[in-house]
């Protein structure tokens, strides 16, 4: 193994998806996995296969599709979890099972109610059983940040002896300071020697996740567990884009250490994850925030114009931010120019059907918008890719909401080869839209979350709506996306998109149920 190579383990599809409101359906997870592969991620933690039939389906389908990245499923130190993980990743070109058990005194006493010897016995069993499915097993000492080093060494000896190749040390509650975590990693890395790769997984409860990750790398960790945009439970995880660019930019500190991440794909990956989850990075977010390469101060602007490095320590192009587009699109632009633009923006694997549908929407948009920005095009392509599976397709929407009148929505939806029209009143315009769609489709949705943002600037900016809708008590809420200059039209599209996601998932699970054991 190259001791200077930092393995990048992305857990956006597992830990990142556990962020409130960030759930993804299988098709969305596949889109993200394909982009992560393009980004050059070494290991993709595709989910927790035993958590639900939907999770199993997502992990197994990603395992079938991805060829260059190792596909991993999380599993508790429980036989059935490990079995489901093994079955889910069995078709992967490169596969891994990531199993874990808590090792901190507080977790062992209050959560597990187990002694240290019992924890070690369970850990050995988990690794040995996982090895019957895959050769590559990772073991995590949950809450390592609050665990005792002598006991962690005992656990490490046991699981390495059982066949674990990677030992992960999670700061599960984001408690450690960089100096403390660095010292812990240094001691345990030296203890492991060449027997196993030391990994870290840092949470951001004190805002130190990336700092802790970098401290670990400087002290011997050779795998970092990260997420796109820093998504994750509570305050999130170490952000892939931050850790990777810090290692690349600060060669004076990290020396010969490197990752094989294709950094010009960082921005496209960030935008895809933000679009799918509906969770936008804060404007001043490092690397991928809207203001990351913006300079408003006159002094700063003057400096950058004279010499870029006066106020920019990395080039926007290094992470895929295109600041000066050379190809301007308008209503007279043809299909060839549109294709060139989307390739320039990094969408080189768009299907012909997705391209054609996006181009038709582009022409409609160009008739209503003076200037088409790169972000407009990016959103059109992403939206089309996410909404291609259309059981129901919105054809038309007309709303009436007079100041003293009753909000009414008239909706036309295409189902198979039939156009169905109906209208309903509601407590507000949105309520009227949702009630009409429910009447047409026969499904009653419960709105769990609703977000709307302006994609670009100006009065004619595109509105991006993200909804989370529940259609039955046994399934999670499904995410839908809508894009339009008209916010209510985008809302209707997003609601129908959530329904289509629900129906698509339901159809796939009924076909794959025989694979669940």
Curated annotation (Swiss-Prot):
InterPro entries: 2-IPM_HCS-like (IPR050073), 2-isopropylmalate_synth_dimer (IPR013709), AIPM/Hcit_synth_CS (IPR002034), Aldolase_TIM (IPR013785), LeuA/HCS_post-cat (IPR054691), LeuA_allosteric_dom_sf (IPR036230), LeuA_bact_synth (IPR005671), PYR_CT (IPR000891). One of its GO terms (biological process) is L-leucine biosynthetic process. PROSITE patterns: AIPM_HOMOCIT_SYNTH_1, AIPM_HOMOCIT_SYNTH_2, PYR_CT. It comes from the Bacteria. One of its GO terms (molecular function) is 2-isopropylmalate synthase activity. Coiled coil: none annotated. Residues 6-267 form the Pyruvate carboxyltransferase domain. Its cofactor is Mn(2+). Homodimer. Belongs to the alpha-IPM synthase/homocitrate synthase family. LeuA type 1 subfamily. NCBIfam families: leuA_bact, PRK00915.1-3. Catalyzes the condensation of the acetyl group of acetyl-CoA with 3-methyl-2-oxobutanoate (2-ketoisovalerate) to form 3-carboxy-3-hydroxy-4-methylpentanoate (2-isopropylmalate). This is 2-isopropylmalate synthase. It comes from Aliarcobacter butzleri (strain RM4018). The lineage of its organism: Bacteria, Pseudomonadati, Campylobacterota, Epsilonproteobacteria, Campylobacterales. The gene is leuA.
